[in-house]
UniProtKB/Swiss-Prot annotation:
Start and end residues of each Helicase ATP-binding domain: 33-197
Complex formation: Monomer.
Domain (Helicase C-terminal) ranges: 229-422
Motif (DEAH box): 145-148
Function, as annotated: DNA-dependent ATPase and 3'-5' DNA helicase that may be involved in repair of stalled replication forks.
Residues the entry annotates as binding ATP: Q28, I46, P47, T48, A49, S50, G51, K52, T53
Molecular function as annotated in GO: 3'-5' DNA helicase activity; ATP binding; ATP hydrolysis activity; DNA binding
Family: Belongs to the helicase family. Hel308 subfamily.
Full protein name: ATP-dependent DNA helicase Hel308
PANTHER family found in the cross-reference section: ATP-DEPENDENT DNA HELICASE HEL308 (PTHR47961:SF10), DNA POLYMERASE THETA, PUTATIVE (AFU_ORTHOLOGUE AFUA_1G05260)-RELATED (PTHR47961)
GO BP, sorted A to Z: DNA repair
PROSITE patterns: HELICASE_ATP_BIND_1 (PS51192), HELICASE_CTER (PS51194), Q_MOTIF (PS51195)
Gene name for this UniProt entry: hel308
Length: 715
């Protein structure tokens, strides 16, 4: 179907023409003529790279141009929010303003009222609903990308609560991978189901077993090893994406492939890859990445820093990196297709031991094969070492993905959501809570909300006992200040209880390590794991720092305690300005893990401070916690705090300024630019920016130094 034939605003057609889109894929045409443009709900369950986002874009923009109002586009990951934000920016030329909202869960963000299209993570939007942001009543369209995550243990319940809240308030468009029970999900949403297996690039799937690829069409092809599949793709000037089940395996595999693949590269490519490797910040994880990069290979997992992940994704898309070995984080929606996808593992470790990776996830990995516009066909191959190819084929290639089931019974999330219903949506009786639950996917799947009755009563009594709520003489449930603050902080009531119980000890004897250990014990922070080899070090450190902790080692739950303790030690090293590389080496963590726990820890220290305020602790306690929050955010000692308000100044530059004698803003403001330029890591642009921030406009013209080539060319 031609774009011209669509009954949409002509201005939309112009923007699509500029993008080079004149024809729609069959599932796009089906979706856009199904009633979605008339405001009807839709569930679009089609393969990866079949143009789901474009359907949502056209539906949103057409509706907003016609009626005004707002649209919210929900994504599961911050990185995906950034990607979608860039895509939606195209529509600003039609006068629609696009904003992105992630993180900071303690804000109404009324500034978003000035925007038309808001890209947000589910958790952020859930927190905005709790804060009662006034602009939400103007939301006409809610798009839920990766809606199949409603079946995920971690985030499913949050997504389900959001959709239940918005079902009768806005048009719902769900974008999903191929799932086992789309009809059931569509019926709950009262949505038209658009289901298709059509792909813009044909997908050829097979199983590698004992030296042969057994293709689903019955053909076989000989390859001496699975690695030969990668080398073969490179000889054909194509890239490969290899999925493995563990970070360490991703790194090891990338380094092994790199040794051989460098022989296939041109001198120009080797030179560019060397430059890329040299641009990485120094730390043990990046050393391995740099080594792999020099052979045209990279690994990609959640332990990489954000900049490194972006660098890998962009250079793989460009074709400079030939192979990426990834854990399934890359298959979670980030747009990085490859000609050939190789799935090395169909099992993974979990807290319950080894378990099969779900069919849905394997099929999503395989769906990354084939790059629209570049490949006529994409190839996805599962490597089997023990199972017969026919068994693997039946299960993962011909098999139907698992059905989605509501995760509303997840106690931790249910605790927070029930408090939110009482504290921010003013539900005042058990009856109202049950009525709400009757509208959920949980109830739709035939599960009687009253089967949750015992659990809900337990949660309500927990909230009552810990002074989050009260029950009046008229049997009305009312939120108390602690309950209201906890719901708006977007933390688990159990976290708030731990804070409440520990604050008297903190007031008596405040110390950073003890506080960092407390927040690491809460359900809102996933603590760092540790291996057997680390146990002696952790036990030694525990006996050294025992007096600083507010909890003693619980031998019955030693693992939980020591994971939290290791996390606290990492955070403590971070706020004492231990270089990142040293932290990575000493504590056997990855840079990405440091960023993850720092971001969550800052939020939890802030929440602890807010709970202290609500419970009317002294200003000294509140100031102490605010100082610690800033230290956690920037990774600095206390004396550097005044310097952190300067633009372009991070922990390293702040320390360099301090050590050079610039210990406060006044001394920097009164300094000569030449003095500031002598500080390590401080260049002309930075001097101009920090002085401008302090009210001094300067323009620095740097003359070339004597003896340099530039001096002779431009004396």
């Amino acid at each position: 179907m031609k774009v011209e034939e669509l009954r949409i605003d002509e201005r939309i057609k112009e923007v699509l023409k500029k993008r080079g889109i004149s024809e729609l894929y069959p599932p796009q045409a089906e979706a856009l003529t199904s009633g979605i443009l008339k405001g009807e709900n839709a569930l679009i369950a089609i393969p990866t790279a079949s143009g789901k986002t474009l359907i949502a874009e056209i539906a949103i923009v057409n509706r907003l141009l016609k009626e005004g109002g707002k649209a919210v586009y929900l994504v599961p990951l911050k990185a995906l929010a950034e990607e979608k934000f860039k895509e939606f920016k195209d529509w600003e030329e039609l006068g629609l303003k696009v904003a992105m909202a992630t993180g900071d869960y303690d804000s109404k963000d009324e500034w978003l009222g000035g925007y038309d299209i808001i890209i947000a993570t589910a958790e952020k939007f859930d927190s905005l609903l709790r804060h009662g942001s006034s602009w939400i009543r103007n939301v006409k369209v809610l798009v839920v990308d990766e809606i199949h995550l409603i079946g995920s243990r971690d985030r499913g319940a949050t997504l389900e609560f959001i959709i239940t809240q918005m079902l009768n308030r806005a048009q719902i468009i769900g974008l999903s991978a191929t799932i086992g029970n789309p009809e059931e999900l569509a019926e709950w949403l009262n949505a038209k189901l658009i289901k298709s297996d059509w792909r813009p690039v044909k997908l050829r799937r097979g199983v590698f077993y004992q030296g042969f690829v057994f293709w689903e069409d019955g053909k076989t092809e000989k390859f001496n090893s699975w690695e030969e599949l990668v080398y073969d793709a490179i000889k054909r000037s194509k890239g490969s994406l290899v999925f493995v089940n563990m970070r360490r395996k991703a790194e090891k595999t990338a380094l092994e492939l790199s040794k051989k693949i460098r022989n296939f590269l041109t001198k120009k490519e080797l030179r560019e890859l060397k430059e890329l490797a040299e641009s990485l910040e120094e730390n043990p994880t990046n050393e391995k990445l740099a080594k792999a990069l020099q052979g045209g290979v990279a690994f990609h997992h959640a332990g990489l820093g954000r900049e490194e992940r972006v660098l890998v994704e962009e250079n793989f898309k460009k074709g400079l990196i030939k192979v990426v070995v990834a854990t399934p984080t890359l298959s979670a929606g980030i747009n990085t297709p490859a000609f050939r996808v190789i799935v090395r593992d169909t099992w993974r470790y979990s807290e319950f031991g080894m378990e099969r990776i779900p069919i849905l996830e394997i099929q999503q990995m395989m769906g990354r094969a084939g790059r629209p516009k570049y490949d006529e066909v994409g190839e996805a191959i599962i490597v089997s070492t023990t199972e017969e190819p026919s068994t693997v084929m039946e299960r993962y290639i011909k098999g139907k993905p698992e059905k989605l089931f509501s995760q509303l019974s997840n106690e931790s999330i249910l605790r927070g959501q029930i408090l939110a219903l009482i504290a921010t949506f003013n539900f005042s009786s058990f009856r109202e809570i049950y009525d709400f639950l009757e509208r959920t996917f949980y109830a739709y799947q035939g599960k009687d909300p009253y089967t949750l009755e015992d659990r809900i009563r337990d949660i309500v009594y927990f909230l009552l006992e810990n002074e989050f709520i009260e029950i009046t003489l008229d049997d009305e449930i009312k939120a108390l200040p602690l309950g209201i603050r906890t719901a708006k902080l977007y933390i688990d009531p159990m976290t708030a209880k731990i804070f409440k119980d520990t604050l008297p000890k903190i007031e008596k004897d405040p110390n950073p390590l003890g506080i960092l250990h407390v927040i690491s014990l809460t359900p809102d922070l996933i603590p760092l794991p540790y291996g057997k080899k680390e146990l002696p070090m952790l036990e030694d450190e525990y006996y050294s720092f025992k007096d600083r902790l507010y909890f003693e080692l619980d031998w019955e739950d030693e693992r939980k305690f020591l994971r939290a303790f290791k996390t606290a030690l990492v955070l403590n090293a971070w706020i004492n300005e231990v270089p990142e590389g040293e932290i990575v080496e000493k504590f056997n963590v990855e840079p990405g893990d440091i960023y993850r726990i720092v971001e969550t820890a800052e939020w939890l220290v802030y929440s602890l401070k807010e709970i202290a305020k609500t419970l009317e602790y002294s200003q000294d306690v509140i100031n102490y916690l605010e100082t610690l929050r800033v230290r956690v955010k920037h990774g600095i000692r206390e004396e550097l705090i005044p310097l952190m308000e300067l633009p372009m100044i991070g922990r390293k530059r702040a320390r360099a300024l301090y050590n050079a004698g610039f210990r406060d803003l006044e001394s920097i403001k009164n300094a000569r630019p030449a003095e500031l330029l002598e500080v390590e890591g401080i260049g002309a642009k930075i001097v101009e920016a920090i002085l401008k921030h302090l009210g001094r406009e300067v323009k620095i013209v740097q003359k070339p130094r004597k003896g340099t080539l530039d001096y002779y060319l431009h004396p």
